C-alpha cells in the first residue's frame, strides 16, 4: 500500500515562511506610509502665462532639412529641420503640427518620417501655440533593452533572478516614490537617504533570501557597512572641503531652491555615496554570510574565532574586485569631464585639487571603505550568531 505524500499547499508555505511574510507585510505598510508622507502637497496655482507640455508625436513628413555633417563635431549632424508631426498624447492628441528640430552636438539628431519623438508644446495666454522637438522618443527602445535584461536575469538566475528583479523594483519605488519627493519637501538629506537605504537593504535581502540566520546577518552587516560609508564620506568631505554645492548639474537645483523648494543641497554628495555603496555592500555581506553558513554546516565544531577567520579569508578575495568596481564606476561616470580636464595640461596637483576630481575620489573611496569594513562586521556577526548555541552549551 502506497503512502500518501503530503502536498505542500499555500497554507503550508505560509506556515514555513511566516517570518518572511510578516517582514514583507510590515515593509509594505512602511512603504505606503512613507509614500503618503513624502507625497507633494497639492497647491492651487495661478493660471500661468505660459504652459509647457511634453507630448509624444510621430513624424509624418520632413518639410525642410538644412542639416549637414560637421567635421568639428566628429562628423555629427548640425542644422535644423521643419517637420510635420501628429501628436499622440495630451490635449492636442490627433492634431498635426509643424515643429522645428534643432540638430547639433548639444541637441538631438535628425529625424525621419515614421520616427517617434517627444515634443515641447508651449501654450501662451493669448492663444499662441509653439512646438519644438525635445528629444527622440526612446521609450520603446528602452523597453526592449529592459525586457532583454529581465529575460537574461530570469533565464540565468531562475527563481533567484526573478526575486532579484522584484527587489530591484522595490528599490526603484523607494528612490523615486519616497526618497526624491521627501528631499523635495525639505527632509534631511543624509538621514532620509540612510533610512531609505537601510529599508532597501532589509527588504531586498528578505525577498532574495527570506528570513534566515544568514540573511539576517547580511542585513545587519549591510546596514552597518552603509553607516560606515556615510561616516567616512562625511570625514572625507570635511578634509577635502567639497560639498553638494560643487556637484555637476547642481545649478538647476540652486535655482529651484530660490523659488521656494526647501531641498537640502549640502548632503547630496554623501547621500550619493550611500546609494552607490549600497548595492556592493549587500553583495558582499550576503556572500560572506552565505559562505559562513555553508562552512558552519560542513563543520559545526568550528569555534567563533575560526569561523570569523574563515569569513575574513573569503572577504579578502572580494575586496580587490569590489573596490575596483566602485572606483571605476565613479571614474567612468565622469570620464568625459576628466578627459577634458586632462586635455588642459593641468599638473597632477591641479587635477587632483579640482573640485570635480576630488568629489569623484571621495565618492569612490568612501563607498569602497563601506564595502571593505562591512566584511569584518558581517563575518563577526555571522560567526557570533552561528556559534551562539555552542557557546551557551
Locate the predicted segments by residue.
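Structural detector for short beta-strands of small beta-barrel domains
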Residues: 50-79
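Loop-to-transmembrane-helix entry motif
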Residues: 17, 185, 189, 311-326, ...
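Transmembrane alpha-helical segments that form the functional core of multipass membrane systems
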Residues: 147-154, 159-255, 263-276
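Extended, hydrophilic extramembrane loops/domains of integral membrane proteins
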Residues: 103-140
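Hydrophobic secretory-pathway targeting helix
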Residues: 1-52
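Pore-lining and gate-forming transmembrane alpha-helices of multi-pass membrane transport proteins
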Residues: 221-226, 258-259, 263-275, 321, ...
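Hydrophobic alpha-helical transmembrane segments of membrane transport and translocation systems
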Residues: 329-331, 335-393
Amino acid at each position: 500500500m502506497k503512502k500518501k505524500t503530503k502536498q505542500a499547499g499555500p497554507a503550508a508555505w505560509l506556515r514555513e515562511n511566516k517570518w518572511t511574510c510578516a517582514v514583507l507585510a510590515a515593509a509594505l505598510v512602511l512603504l505606503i506610509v512613507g509614500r503618503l508622507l513624502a507625497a507633494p502637497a497639492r497647491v492651487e496655482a495661478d493660471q500661468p502665462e505660459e504652459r509647457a507640455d511634453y507630448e509624444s508625436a510621430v513624424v509624418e513628413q520632413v518639410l525642410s532639412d538644412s542639416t549637414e555633417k560637421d567635421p568639428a563635431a566628429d562628423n555629427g549632424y548640425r542644422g535644423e529641420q521643419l517637420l510635420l508631426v501628429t501628436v499622440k498624447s495630451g490635449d492636442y492628441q490627433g492634431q498635426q503640427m509643424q515643429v522645428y528640430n534643432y540638430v547639433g552636438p548639444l541637441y538631438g539628431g535628425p529625424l525621419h518620417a515614421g520616427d517617434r519623438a517627444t515634443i515641447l508644446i508651449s501654450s501662451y495666454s493669448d492663444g499662441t501655440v509653439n512646438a519644438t522637438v525635445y528629444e527622440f522618443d526612446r521609450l520603446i527602445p528602452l523597453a526592449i533593452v529592459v525586457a532583454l535584461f529581465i529575460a537574461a536575469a530570469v533565464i540565468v538566475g531562475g527563481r533567484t533572478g526573478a526575486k532579484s528583479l522584484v527587489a530591484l523594483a522595490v528599490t526603484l519605488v523607494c528612490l523615486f516614490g519616497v526618497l526624491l519627493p521627501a528631499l523635495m519637501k525639505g527632509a534631511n538629506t543624509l538621514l532620509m537617504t540612510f533610512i531609505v537605504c537601510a529599508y532597501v537593504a532589509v527588504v531586498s535581502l528578505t525577498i532574495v533570501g527570506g528570513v534566515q540566520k544568514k540573511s539576517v546577518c547580511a542585513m545587519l552587516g549591510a546596514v552597518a557597512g552603509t553607516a560606515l560609508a556615510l561616516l567616512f564620506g562625511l570625514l572625507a568631505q570635511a578634509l577635502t572641503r567639497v560639498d553638494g554645492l560643487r556637484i555637476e548639474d547642481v545649478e538647476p537645483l540652486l535655482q529651484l531652491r530660490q523659488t521656494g523648494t526647501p531641498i537640502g543641497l549640502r548632503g547630496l554628495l554623501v547621500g550619493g555615496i550611500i546609494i552607490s555603496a549600497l548595492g556592493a555592500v549587500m553583495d558582499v555581506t550576503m556572500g560572506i554570510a552565505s559562505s559562513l553558513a555553508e562552512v558552519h554546516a560542513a563543520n559545526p565544531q568550528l569555534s567563533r574565532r575560526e569561523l570569523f577567520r574563515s569569513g575574513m579569508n573569503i572577504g579578502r578575495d572580494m575586496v580587490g574586485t569590489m573596490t575596483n568596481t566602485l572606483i571605476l564606476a565613479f571614474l567612468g561616470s565622469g570620464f568625459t569631464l576628466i578627459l577634458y580636464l586632462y586635455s588642459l595640461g593641468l599638473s597632477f596637483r591641479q587635477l587632483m585639487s579640482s573640485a570635480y576630481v576630488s568629489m569623484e575620489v571621495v565618492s569612490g573611496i568612501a563607498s569602497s571603505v563601506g564595502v571593505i569594513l562591512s566584511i569584518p562586521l558581517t563575518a563577526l556577526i555571522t560567526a557570533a550568531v552561528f556559534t551562539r548555541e555552542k557557546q551557551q552549551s
